[in-house]
Amino acid sequence: MGTIRKSTASIDRFFAEAHDISFHNYVSYRTVEFLWRGARYRLVSTGDLYVLDYSGLPALVHPFESVYKNEHISCVSVADQRNYYVRRRKQIRLKDLVWAAFGDRDLPKGSHIICKNGNWQSCGINNLEVDQYGVSSKGSSL
């Protein structure tokens, strides 16, 4: 089905269907969670492999192709109950999730995403904001 790219109707369709999107940052791993088409997706980064928990059934997916803004999230679907999975059914870039929250421009050089409430473990997509060189840029429309 291809990669969802910024500035396309694909992102709009995905976010019209995805709900409860949240980012969680822990000491040794990161997760992105969302509901999509009746199933809860939970992607876990442990540095090398990314695990997708699809309706309680774990499956290994491809590692992100690079770090931070250019990461790729591979969503897979369960084909049957014999642990056979269809890979590459949908790919969503983590950067695209951020774009959908902040707008259609890339992050300014030297910027990164922070959680406004200071707690990544309970940070929803609406609590994300841009931080540049250690100075919060609240109100930035990106």
Where are these regions (language model features)?
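Acidic catalytic motifs of isoprenoid enzymes
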Residues: 116
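Conserved recognition-core residues within compact binding domains
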Residues: 2-110, 119-142
